[in-house]
């Protein structure tokens, strides 16, 4: 019951955050986002407490970093004169992705062959898509960094799906990875494609919070494998 209650709390607080995000600025935006972030970390802790294990603790560390990233990225909008907020937020999210990857490999074991295939698939797919839309988007000097990020994002998502099928990884983690994939690709179009609209931001944030909830729920499933 507690897990259901926390899931509802994440959904409600995220809905309030998204509502305020597309309509206003200021402390209420950061406060509601922080509440949603704290809620999905707490949900992860509760899920992990039912079946603790090394992989689950690594995943929980990733969720905490996601919470830190959330708070600092929104603080960077409230206090744009503090450039360190943006850097800390981006670094926290980068380490969260690394923590999730580490947790998956602790839970299921690392497969160089399947990861290599996923990496090749990710690179080919990202290159094909971004080159196809390049003329419609303004990447500036960030085109190749965007290609690298999109390649890794696609590769890890594909790898998690493979490990769900052959390695017994929690299905909720693969779903979460897929939602993160959608959310982050939307960000590319928001930043470089002139799609910074209320509708796109709502879609981006909705898939992001849904991804974090899926990650949190998966902690018990991850821990059961180690």
Give the ranges of each region predicted by the language model.
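Polytopic alpha-helical membrane-helix bundles and their juxtamembrane interface segments
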Residues: 1-226
């Amino acid at each position: 019951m507690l897990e259901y209650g926390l899931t509802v709390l994440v959904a409600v607080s995220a809905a309030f955050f998204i509502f305020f995000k597309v309509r206003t600025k200021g402390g209420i935006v950061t406060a509601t986002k922080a509440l949603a972030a704290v809620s999905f970390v707490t949900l992860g802790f509760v899920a992990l407490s039912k079946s603790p294990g090394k992989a689950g603790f690594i995943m929980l560390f990733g969720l905490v970093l996601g919470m830190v990233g959330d708070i600092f990225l929104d603080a960077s909008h409230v206090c744009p004169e503090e450039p360190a907020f943006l850097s800390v937020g981006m670094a926290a999210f980068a380490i969260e992705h690394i923590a999730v990857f580490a947790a998956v490999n602790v839970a299921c074991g690392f497969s160089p062959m399947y990861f290599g295939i996923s990496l090749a698939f990710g690179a080919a797919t990202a290159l094909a898509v971004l080159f196809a839309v390049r003329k419609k988007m303004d990447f500036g000097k960030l085109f190749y960094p965007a290609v690298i990020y999109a390649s890794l994002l696609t590769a890890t998502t594909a790898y998690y799906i493979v490990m769900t099928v052959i390695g017994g990884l929690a299905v909720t983690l693969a779903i979460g990875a897929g939602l993160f994939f959608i959310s982050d690709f939307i960000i590319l179009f928001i930043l470089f494609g002139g799609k910074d609209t209320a509708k796109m931001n709502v879609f981006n944030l909705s898939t992001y919070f849904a991804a974090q909830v899926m990650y949190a729920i998966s902690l018990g499933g991850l821990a059961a494998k180690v």
